[in-house]
Amino acid sequence: MSGFYQASLRSRGIEPVMPAAAAQRDIAACIEAVKATQIDAAAGHLSRALATLERRKVSVAVMGCTEIPIAARALRNARVMLIDSTQELARATVAYAVERGWGRAA
């Protein structure tokens, strides 16, 4: 983990919660399962990781890897709000471009 999201959250007064070692292993297994196109298995790993976060009273999790949202779509009842970092980056990029008039005919 690079620490990018943690630093950004702290700069906004939000204290990040890192997944425990077992949850990190489940997240890694989730990513590997997605790469192997084993989406149901990936969702199971992700569900276990999210359950550990929920027990720690975490209500929002950043999906900071492109494979995780693929597994998340297969979840049935995620009780932790999931933020897709790739989707949010795309939204911010479009907003940035629109604010500057990029793509408009002169």
Feature roles, as predicted:
Residues 1-106:
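Non-catalytic structural scaffold of enzyme domains
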